[in-house]
Amino acid sequence: MTIEFETPKPIAQIQFVLKTVAQEMMRSQSRYFDENEHDIPFSYIEFMHTAMKSTGGGSLTPKDDKPKEGAEKRPPIGYQTLAAQIEMLAWGDVGFYLITPGGGLGAAAVQAAGSPEQRAKFLARFAGEKPTFAAMCMTEAGAGSDTSAIRTRAVLDEATQEWVINGEKIFVTGGDKSFTEYEQFGKGFIVVWASIDPTAGRAGMRAFVVESGTKGVSIVKLEHKLGIRASDTAVISLVDVRVPYDNILGSATVEKTTTGFKGAMATFDATRPLVAASGIGVARAALESLKEKLTEQEVEIRYGLPRNKLTSIERDVIDMEIQLRSAWLLVLKAVWMADNKKSNALESSMSKVRAGDIVTKITQKAVEIMGPLGYSREFLFEKWFRDAKITDIYEGTGQINRLVVARHILGYSGKELR
């Protein structure tokens, strides 16, 4: 199989439509929701839900590429399409992209670790009448990237055949919209990672679907953040939370193999290139706006000249373009592998590392070149700079992903290389 570098026609058509949405509905409201962090853009959410339903989908999730009987067989492009959608929406506003209705990380966890019956049960709601959200609850105070240190516990009540969960989760992206029962939204859920056997380490870790409105769950607070302010980030407390036995994703039997941990990692292998795509969208927004401002000032970027003949600004802009394109190619490889059912743990982490680096560098350089105007709220350059950093932090920090890359390349285990 070969990777095609030309954008498939179905993807190009989607990008054309989304660019209008990104420009007119997202970019135009960026500043307001940046300065009013916990307001909810209900009109955008409702519009996107209606639009996605009209195209046969209910959320930003990869569509089934299986051809209908008798139809021409085409290469799978589900994750490639999703990456292109996310990049364009993040180009509009990455905070808005993060509140686009759908399953998000919560649905990705069900997709990666759930049974066919669980996927049918929990994922169908995203194509319902109302916008619906799901979130993943993994991070804890003192247990961020070290998943083996998770202290949230799930104990089986033999009498009722229910799991009883206790713990607290922090930095839950979309936690409020996924769990709080808003009249405008459908019934969402959160996926809580907890240990069913503390002595087993990562092997005892499992994910549980907790439906919105479940007793014992409370939103403790919403974070005030540096960037992505249109998206809510919650602290969630779980006190004697009871969920049905069948809401555990995967087997309830603890074995020596780290089955639960592998379920979490499978989720990230699928989503890290998509996080990278969102960062690339932010970087492209900053770079394109910078070039527009330079053009207004009659500053020409002369491509094709030897480097020593270029001005400092020309070198900077060309370097920014190189960084952007190289990062996008890594994303394309990772999502192509996901579409073709190839193991992409290495490529997934590589794309995340590269995007986390370049989006920070490109947005910072754009602010520098713009000078005081880049630092001013008159333009969005300073906002893109603030929005950029999260790409390197969530869904595996740059440091963690560098470890993943090194282990794969050198052939070391997690114990051998920390």
Model segments located where?
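Amphipathic, small/basic residue-rich leader segments at the start of a protein or domain
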Residues: 1-100, 121, 412-418
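Glycine-rich beta->alpha junctions and the first turn(s) of the following alpha-helix
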Residues: 3-9, 13-14, 74, 219-324, ...
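Glycine-rich phosphate/cofactor-binding loops in nucleotide/flavin-utilizing enzymes
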Residues: 4, 85, 370-418
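C-terminal helix-coil-helix/basic helical segment that borders enzyme active sites and/or dimer interfaces
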Residues: 26-38, 295, 299, 321-354, ...
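N-terminal glycine-rich flavin-associated loop
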Residues: 87, 97-117, 144, 156
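Glycine-rich phosphate/pyrophosphate-binding beta-alpha loops
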Residues: 91-94, 143, 170-177, 228, ...
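A short, Trp-centered hydrophobic/proline-enriched beta-strand micro-motif
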Residues: 129-138, 193
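A short core secondary-structure module
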Residues: 162, 166-218
